[in-house]
A protein has these predicted regions:
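Anionic-ligand binding patches
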Residues: 2-4, 10-187
Length: 187
């Protein structure tokens, strides 16, 4: 069975493939013939943005996700704006730099990642989610992962997502948790 993922982000696709491959064949939106469709994420929540990503695509199973990093000391920012925290011309590095600047004098470093996966199957749309709690580091650590991974240490661990192997990260990450709930929903 094919799962079309409404993304061309190779990091996300790699994580998803590692977690569901063997049971399902994962295709990016471009591989499925939808490369010219670029939904605008203008929702006010992760749930809305995840659904926006899947609505224009068709297939046996279509999924789209949105993820946010919610920092307690910043009243939940960057939250739904995590991917564009440093502005429309921002990137992962600029987003991390902005977050570290804003956290410079903060003692409360608690944060959590939340991933919402929207699923379209047989005309039905539903969402599942996964949360990973942890804390923000004072500087970037590690070379793996993407996004805020070098700044986030999950609860119960002493290293950032970027310092973990893919297997370690997938076992505890927000996206890994959401994907496991998604796979269970198919069975």
């Amino acid at each position: 069975m094919n799962i079309i993922v409404s993304t061309d982000n190779q990091h996300k696709l790699k994580e998803i493939r590692e977690l569901v491959e063997g049971k399902y064949h994962v295709l990016s939106k471009t591989e499925a013939g939808f490369g010219n469709i670029h939904p605008i994420e203008n929702g006010d929540s992760l749930e809305e943005n995840a659904v926006i990503k899947i609505k224009p695509l068709e297939g046996e199973i279509v999924i789209g996700d949105d993820t946010g990093l919610f920092v307690h000391a910043l009243d939940g920012r960057p939250g739904v704006y995590s991917a564009r925290y440093a502005g429309e011309d921002g990137n992962d590095e600029k987003n991390r730099e902005k977050l570290l600047r804003e956290m410079k004098d903060k003692t409360d470093r608690r944060a959590y990642f939340k991933t919402v996966i929207a699923v379209k199957r047989g005309g039905e749309i539903y969402t599942v989610d996964g949360i990973c709690r942890g804390k923000i580091t004072e500087s970037a650590k590690g070379d793996g992962g993407f996004g805020y991974d070098p700044l986030f240490i999950p609860e119960g661990y002493s290293k950032t997502f970027a310092e973990m192997t893919d297997q370690e990260k997938n076992a505890v990450s927000h996206r890994g948790r959401a994907l496991r709930v998604f796979v269970e929903s198919l069975e």
